[in-house]
Amino acid sequence: MFGSPKRAALAAASLLAIFGNGPSVMAQETSSNNAVVADGKTFALNGENVSYRFRVNETTGDLVSDHFGGSITGDLFPGFGAEALGGWVGLAGRFRREFPDHGRGDFRIPAVRIRQEAGYTVTDLQYQSYSVIPGKPALPGLPSTFGSEEDVTTLVVHLYDNYSSIAVDLSYSIFPKYDAIVRSANVTNKGTQNITVEALSSFSFDFPYEDLEMISLRGDWAREAHRQRRKVEYGLQGFGSSTGFSSHLHNPFLAIVHPSTTESQGEAWGFNLVYTGSFSVDVEKGSQGLTRALLGFNPSQLSWQLGAGETLTSPECVSVYSSDGIGGMSRSFHRLYRNHLIKSKFATSDRPPLLNSWEGLYFDYNESTIYRLAEESAALGVKLFVMDDGWFGDKYPRVSDNAGLGDWVPNPDRFPDGLTPLVEDVTKLKAGNSSTDLRFGLWVEPEMANPNSTLYHEHPDWVLHAGQYPRTLQRNQLVLNLALPEVQDYIIDEITNILNSSAISYVKWDFNRAMHETPSPSNDHEYILGMYRVFDTLTTRFPDVLWEGCASGGGRFDPGVLEYFPQIWTSDNTDALMRITIQLGTSLAYPPSAMGAHLSAVPNAQTGRTIPVKFRGHVAMMGGSFGLELDPAELQEDEKAEVPGLIALAEKVNPIILTGDMWRLRLPEESNWPAVLFISEDGNQAVLFYFQLGPNVNHATPWLRLQGLDPKATYSVDGNGSYSGATLMNMGLQYKFESDYDSKVVFLQKQ
């Protein structure tokens, strides 16, 4: 017990011995752009508006966190840990630890837990050395951000446990222009006995004692990405996925903010795991008020054995800092992902307006039906026609969701001569009154198999299964085990054959169920590594194909998928009112350029709601990939007459959506008049999306203040005169709406 003043003083001295006194900077190595400054004792990463500092305690070799926030220079004020007043004190748990290991007196959740062959889970990871690398190495087998030596600098800190011969390398890559620090960790077995990694975080940070709040994205099928903001309480709180994919339930995104932080003001820290598998986000406020945030593998889905010389690499975690509120945080993510994550040539290229056959026809079609739909699509001005589920399966034809998955050959009853004649006929059609040929796209779900399929009958061992336990069906299908190289090769070969057979310029890659009955905890990560190999091989082999990710909507809307697929279907819910919430929630981390959004028929297939076509179109064109999800023959004549104009408007705004900055002016959770402003990359153009959700009877409409404009410049506002940026931001503008579900799209031009 530390009941006496003498014992309290001794305890305080012990704390300082473990974690040192205040830090000072540096007789040091400095990168050419000053982004990394290090001397082996103290480390600093510097962006345009961010500083990240940590140090080594020279007595123990522990890494201690000092600062992650606004830019700082020079020496740091000498802080101290919590005083050891009366009572039992867990020493390590009272200080800010940069990469907390397990079993040495820190009883908060660790960043790493490793079981040795003897059963021990204690690690004593001490600082050994560091290296500074211009640019950024890729992660083996995993998606990762990229950049040149001018864009990014990487610091690698090497830790070592002398007792177990376990090495951990911590990687910090800073993109100064984006105030972004990307972290990952390697665990290497340098000993002779096997070890098992049971927990590993890509990112960990201990915030100082402050009142903080956390923001996450929760949901389920058809209601993804609902923003949730709550106070960080004492104790452990967090979320994650154990479904085998990032999932609709929780996105691998976290923001930490102050209670006073708003969209446009205050500090915000954002974290996003570049991973598509099961994950864990943990936030723990310890007894001393320090808040620990960790993102990484889900420990319940990880038991990774390492033999001598073997290494486990964690996914990357992107962290950004903004002093310009939650909106500033989002814009940093958007810019970074557009320029340094998405590798597709389509990352910032105009996306063709498309029509997808699903909600128009579902499974009920044949060659003539599809051609008729393509003809009507082209007449409206659509430039890409997509044939969704139902085109494949020979012995087990895909006429419902009961059969066919896994057999990627055209259904001979529907397409007796294969797809080639259909594709040739469709791609001869002209979009609207233009000379542009209609393009052809296809839906696939290659990671699945129906029990009613030739593939399953020939290879029942290829699906996920746990011995003799029943194989649980979901949507009448099973998951192929992409941990198996032969399964990966099969998928690569089948999709290659399809794309080589016809002029297919777009692929929608779906994934419609969770993973059950996995054979081992490590299988989840092995699956994801296999999936990334498939994605990388096919997107490299077919760089001119526009790939779109999907998982029953936004179930895999994560940075891992974005590296390979430049756009993702945001939600199966196409109801325009709900889509505003879903799309603005998704935009907390992900660029609107990556969102697939479609104008669908009414009453809406998911909600039964009827909303005017103009409102539906305006909501959909806020996504980078605008499309239609309907049968034009079923439209009312007045609706059909409006669609070509909406397609033309979507094409006009698309370049700004793809490369510009997004400002969420009002949120649908907080206002009857949500509004979003997009400003072009050069600042010369802007487009405002402004909505009225419910009726506004006998009451004034509020003024709307814009953001992000040049206060000294003058802007013309869609035929309503010219005004200074200062006037538009400080006074605002006001519009009259006619009814519920009314909307406006307003263009601004800098003069």
Swiss-Prot record:
Catalytic residues in the record: 510 (nucleophile), 572 (proton donor)
Residues of this chain annotated as glycosylated in UniProt: 49, 57, 162, 186, 194, 366, 433, 452, 500, 720
InterPro entries: Aldolase_TIM, Alpga-gal_N_sf, Alpha-glycosidase_related, Glyco_hydro_27/36_CS, Glyco_hydro_36, Glyco_hydro_36_C, Glyco_hydro_36_N, Glyco_hydro_b
Record bears the keyword Oxidoreductase: no
Catalyzed reactions per annotation: Hydrolysis of terminal, non-reducing alpha-D-galactose residues in alpha-D-galactosides, including galactose oligosaccharides, galactomannans and galactolipids
Molecular function GO labels: alpha-galactosidase activity
One Pfam family, short name: Melibiase
Task performed by this protein: Hydrolyzes a variety of simple alpha-D-galactoside as well as more complex molecules such as oligosaccharides and polysaccharides.
Record family assignment: Belongs to the glycosyl hydrolase 36 family.
Name of this chain's protein: Probable alpha-galactosidase C
Originating species: Aspergillus flavus (strain ATCC 200026 / FGSC A1120 / IAM 13836 / NRRL 3357 / JCM 12722 / SRRC 167)
Organism classification: Eukaryota, Fungi, Dikarya, Ascomycota, Pezizomycotina
Gene label: aglC
